[in-house]
Amino acid sequence: MYLRFGKRVCDIVIGLIALPFVLIIVAICAPLIYFEDKGPIFYNAPRVGKDGRDFTMYKLRSMKVNAPDLVMEDGSTYNGADDPRMTRIGAFMRKASIDEMPQFINVLKGDMSVVGPRPDLRRETELYEGDDGEKLLVKPGITGYAAVYGRNSLPWRDRLKLDVYYVRHVSFALDVKVFFRTFYVIFKQDGVYVEPEDGDVKEASN
């Protein structure tokens, strides 16, 4: 009952409450993003959502225009503290997680949920193994179980296992726990960036 009805109601309520804060953050960050390199304010990120459907995830742009797609050895997207692709304002937004705020619009549209597995790129879903694809049985989230219990400090495949755990145990109580732990994780700045070893990062092939 919660997964089919209650979760959507919670998403709409939280999305509407968050919307004014989203608009304020966009109003403050937009000129800083634009004047740093005269590029677009938003990055419309292609992602894979529930049931394997493609959707556009909205983000404030944190990287330089036409930045290459860097990947880890396991095929996941690189996200390091020394990422040369990030702009100065982008590094701050990424660390504070405010680049993700426009995703509340995705929540109101129904593409995403407030809590759920973080969405992957299409090329990443093609690397799923075993039960990994179960994460696509629910809507992706702005925050999620794997996002607050390890975040980017965990290897990608370990995060996938946590995503599958969430899908198999989703409940109102678990969502509340993840939601409030998100503030704790952001405040402590735990696991914001991945720590790759030499040679682990390469440019994705087209």
List PLM regions with ranges:
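A hydrophobic, helix-centered structural microdomain
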Residues: 1-66, 172, 177-206
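Positions in alpha-helical segments
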Residues: 15, 30, 43, 87-91, ...
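Short, glycine-rich, amphipathic interfacial segments at transmembrane boundaries or analogous
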Residues: 41-85, 143-161
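A short, structured surface patch at a secondary-structure boundary
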Residues: 63, 79-139, 179-182
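Short amphipathic alpha-helical interaction/hinge segments
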Residues: 68-71, 116, 191
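Acyl-group handling in specialized metabolite and lipid biosynthesis
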Residues: 164-167
